[in-house]
Amino acid sequence: MEHTTTFSIGNEGREVFWNAQHFEPILFTLTAVALAIFAYGLYRRWKLWKAMGKEEIRWDKLPARIKSLFVNGFLQVKTWKDAYPGIMHGLIFFGFFVLLFGAIFDAGEFHITEPLFNWSFLRGNFYLGFAFLMQFFGLCVLIGILLALFRRYVLNPERLGYKGKPDNTADDAIALLLILGIIVTGFLISALRIHVTYQQAPWEWVRFVSWGIAAYALAGVETSTALALHKVIWWTHTFIALGFIAYIPYSRLLHMITT
């Protein structure tokens, strides 16, 4: 799919598959595989729940159920009883929620509104605000994950255990490290792109975390080296993100969907 939009001051934006144009078909294939694994995992869980569960009318008390879904599912009120875990969980949950919708926005423009309606909405001031929010909430998730790792593996409060046994399972570490990997590689991908294209796209300072990495950590890196590193980290980010999706139904991460 060809996208030849020219960006400039007043028409700010970014090229979605920058430095990775030829990877698009492979990415779609791998995404289909990850989604198939995800769907199969959900199907297995559903069969297990159906075999173990009791018949129950789920449409009774609908207003109360909707309220509970909003209060406990979206607002995560139960996690705010204690400050540390409440803040930690809020940073991760709400940050990831915004990043998910950001990815949907990106994909919606690239695959639907641009090719079908010739409409690009991630442009100008809207793009600048969008890019800033993606960096801000990405940073929120990063802080939340670091707080979670510190709490679980340094503080390790007793209530994280079960019946006197520690609850630091490999599943917990995998889940936290996958999310950490997605965020860190996402920042690095943007930083490498900014390092190469900052003269053509000076507005990318709104991606303040990646801009800082590009300005300081990548200062002096040759363009050819940055391009090569970008491809490596782009693929690393892709495999981690798709692995995360595929892993959800087989781990405790499933509670993001079921609670």
Regions of interest found by a model, annotated:
Residues 2-259:
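Membrane-embedded alpha-helical bundles of multi-pass integral membrane proteins
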